[in-house]
UniProtKB/Swiss-Prot annotation:
InterPro entries according to UniProt: P-loop_NTPase, Thymidine_kinase, Thymidine_kinase_CS
Keywords noted in UniProt: ATP-binding, DNA synthesis, Kinase, Metal-binding, Nucleotide-binding, Transferase, Virulence, Zinc
Descriptive protein name: Thymidine kinase
GO terms, biological process: DNA biosynthetic process; thymidine metabolic process
Known role: Phosphorylates thymidine. ASFV replicates in the cytoplasm of infected cells and contains genes encoding a number of enzymes needed for DNA synthesis, including thymidine kinase. Important for growth in swine macrophages in vitro and is a virus virulence factor in swine.
Keyword Iron-sulfur: no
Entry similarity comment: Belongs to the thymidine kinase family.
Catalyzed reaction equations: thymidine + ATP = dTMP + ADP + H(+)
Cystine bridges: none
Length: 188
């Protein structure tokens, strides 16, 4: 299936999944396709994302965009004018409390692509994802295999330490993604 047909001006697309599932890799693929179509793309990442100052996945895949502008921000409302931009790509969308700002950009006929976690380490939806969900014309779920048993589909993010902070950026040093069976062993 050619994803580019789903990415139309004025629409919001949402990619959800657990950690380490390939959501950022999917965004990189979308950026490459949009750049091949000579679209001006802006990639927005949260300042809470401590991975790198570039577009980089947990597995180390890095995008070297031709013309894609990278913006780091704590809030989408601080991004400023995007008048000359065709597409807005947002990684770790759950980090942004004002994700609903994407509706304004969609009303301006921009292609909006969001990627975020399906749930927190407490297995609860992020409020900003819940608020933007009804406005998404296309939703994709990317799964992965359980990091504990390597047998079942994993959809749960589990924090390895006792920190209860809702947003705590990190990788495999802080989190594991597991299936329902392994989640029961972790929590109970």
């Amino acid at each position: 299936m050619n994803i580019i047909r789903k990415l139309k001006p004025g629409t919001i697309s949402l990619v959800l999944g657990p950690m380490f599932a390939g959501k950022t890799t999917f965004l990189i693929h979308c950026i490459y396709m949009l750049e091949r179509l000579e679209k001006k793309v802006v990639f927005i990442k949260s300042t809470k994302n401590t991975r790198d100052k570039t577009i980089k996945t947990h597995s180390g895949i890095q995008l070297r965009p031709k013309q894609c502008k990278i913006i780091e921000s704590t809030q989408l409302s601080d991004v400023g004018s995007l008048t000359d931009i065709h597409a807005v790509v947002i990684d770790e969308a759950h980090f942004f409390d004002d994700l609903i700002k994407c509706r304004t950009w969609a009303d301006e006929e921009k292609i909006i692509i969001l990627a975020g976690l399906n749930a927190s380490f407490e297995q609860k939806m992020f409020p900003s994802i819940v608020r933007i969900f009804p406005y998404c014309s296309w939703v994709k779920y990317i799964g992965r295999t359980c990091m504990k048993c390597n047998r079942h589909n994993a959809c749960f993010n589990v924090r390895k330490n006792a920190d209860k902070t809702l947003i705590l950026a990190g990788g495999s040093e802080l989190y594991v993604t597991c299936c329902n069976n392994c989640l029961k062993k972790y929590i109970y």
